[in-house]
Amino acid sequence: KTQMDLSWYNIYVAHKCFEGDDSLLYKNYYDYLLENRICAYTLPYDTAGYYTDERILQYLNNPRVVAFNPIAWKKDADADRVRAAYKFLSQNPAWMEKSYFYVVDEPTDKASLDRVNAVGEVLKENFPGYKMMAPEHVNYALNKDSTADNFSAVQNCINVWCYKPYFYTTFAEYRYSSYTPGQKLTYW
């Protein structure tokens, strides 16, 4: 499955379209990606989790759409919005299968990790069977005396992992120094 950001703002600024066009420009970009088997996080005609525009059904029912963010990218995952999304999407198991929450990008500091967990609690209470991802590009210890790391800090809420191959190779300098005591420089 593929997902990527497709920024409404950047599209409309690049085209100097400031008066609105009923989402046509965004839809054209989204459709181009979809033709090439790439799904953007936010569906055309998305209403941030409330699903009030019936034109969105053409995307929810499209077999090429394999993933989307149920509340749209960069929208608050408050309980009302999440409940509304669940109420609508749970009408069709295929829509639920395509639903992936992505609300915090690359959480690395305490505030962003706490935000992941806070959203996770909202999802647990209001969107049964939720799938939430958080791209992890590094994995740090939570503090210098801790064996806990970013991964462990959010493991109770994240259930779709997006990591880089070196995500699990943590604390490289420390680990390598134990194999090469006294050596100042190591290549790998």
Residue locations for each model-derived region?
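An acidic-aromatic substrate-binding cleft motif
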Residues: 1-75, 90, 94-98, 105
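Generic ordered-secondary-structure signal
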Residues: 2-9, 30, 119, 123, ...
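Long, low-complexity, intrinsically disordered polar/charged segments
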Residues: 3-20, 148-169, 175-188
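Acidic (Asp/Glu)-rich catalytic clusters
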Residues: 30-34, 52-68, 81-96, 123-127, ...
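Aromatic-lined carbohydrate-recognition surfaces of secreted/lumenal glycan-active proteins
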Residues: 43, 97-146, 158-166, 184-188
